Amino acid sequence: MLLHLSDLHFGTEREVCIQAIQQFCQQHRPEAIVVSGDLTQRARFKQFYACRQFLDSLSLPYLVVPGNHDIPLYQVWNRFFSPFVLYQAFFGRLETTLETEHFYIVGVNSIRRRYHTRGHISMEQIHETYEKLNNVPSNKIKLVVFHQPFYISPDQRDDKDCPVLGKIAL
């Protein structure tokens, strides 16, 4: 079993929800946890710290990807020049993989500093994800995790991309 969480929004989290997740994990022991973005409410140090402490306390493997709330909103300079610095300080790489007994999970960063409210992936990300999934043993369930629906910018969109997008579709 895999546990999927999203929009934890540490900084505005509700203790009753946190306790319910902890209790669920203790009772059911999922194979792994996937958190598909919005770990924090406002991308602040204390919020990332609290989220990391919480996830570590579950004592289960986990994969996280950033959400639009995980980059600074009001600190425009930081949003444009170092949007993921705190995220990376606590969770490392923006795009990771997690392999368990039954699952192979690819985390894709769909957040962009300029268009932070819309999901976006590049053709390079699509190709990289395809290559990762292409080499996974057939007995694994393959999953791709991201925060928002994908948006391909008009300058990268072309009918010739449809076969590429179709290849990666699960």
Question: At which residue positions do the language-model features occur?
Answer:
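Active-site neighborhood of phospho(di)ester-bond hydrolases with catalytic His/Asp-centered motifs
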Residues: H4-S6, I33-D38, Y62-N68, N109, ...
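Alpha-helical membrane-targeting segments
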Residues: C17, Q75-L86, D159-I168
